[in-house]
Amino acid sequence: MVSTHIGFPTETVIVFIALSVGAIFIDLFMHRDDKPISLKSAALWSVFWVVVAMAFAGFLYIHHGAEVASLFVTGYALEKVLSVDNLFVMMAIFSWFAVPDRYRHRVLYWGIIGAIVFRGIFVAIGTSLLSLGPYVEVVFAIIVAWTAVMMLKSGDDDDEIEDYSQHLAYRMVKRFFPIWPKLRGHAFLLNQKEVDAELAKPENSDVTIGRGKKAALYATPLFLCVAVVELSDVMFAFDSVPAIIAVSREPLIVYSAMMFAILGLRTLYFVLEALKQYLVHLEKAVIVLLFFIAAKLGLNATDHIWHHGYSIAATTSLYVVLGVLALGILASVMFPGKPESEEKGS
């Protein structure tokens, strides 16, 4: 059997690529329509991704032994634990952009492309790029805390945004490249012909576009949302990649463990999102967790920079997340109030 430069036979690399790409294709094909994902569907797809990961672990066990399979499962579990915070940051991002439920799966799964690329880069170069981590975390801690404040102020207001002209992300980015300030279906980019057609509509008579010049392509608010999701993936990679590299220095083990965990976490996001319809106080718990995550990022980052000795360990973070979620669920059971579906119908 021919071995690759990463220490595994070509057959193993092919199995990993075929299994992961095939599973992504199945997932995307089954969710090709822009429809909100139900709790049952989200739960089943979460199980699907766990089964796919364990199938690869089984292959490693049969062909490379128990030790290699154990390293993969350890890395997989570690990535899951370290990326739990990312679930709540995703909620914050979607809340900030007021992305309709029907487009969220598309946004998250296009975000996978960035995750695949950036995690691959981090694994390839080891820890040299990770030295930037603390500075990225400080910036992201501020953004997460600010988003939590915005969610707290908005309360139960989940209305879609018709025009993003005053949105902070739009105002920050429009000076660099042209943006169409409204959602146009699930499109991420529009060409000049499509933009001209939109500008011809009476309701868009007062719309101004980015730099005010004609361009080959225009980004939409959905594209900006994908970019922020990508940024969150990169930011959390600064935490998880060194931890998993500490488990195994074998690139394929590290990369495959991260990828299967990330793919599964995205479906777990939809489980949490669907539960919000039934657990009316879960969103309050999410807001509390966002403040906690911001504090954790800030403490850990500044400890790396200034060595003040205060930080929050991954295990402590997991206990806090589980505890706050449990309180949110308990409060929803004891004080159910009105589910969102009833409030919208009344």
Swiss-Prot record:
It is found in: Cell membrane. GO terms for cellular component: plasma membrane. One of its GO terms (biological process) is response to tellurium ion. The chain crosses the membrane at residues 6-26, 42-62, 81-101, 110-130, 132-152, 227-247, 252-272, 286-306, 316-336. It holds the Pfam family TerC. Signal peptide: none annotated. It is a multi-pass membrane protein. The keyword Transcription regulation does not apply. The keyword Transferase does not apply. Belongs to the TerC family. Could conceivably alter the intracellular level of tellurium in a manner leading to resistance. Alternatively its presence in the membrane may provide a barrier to entry of the tellurium ions. This is Tellurium resistance protein TerC. The gene is terC.
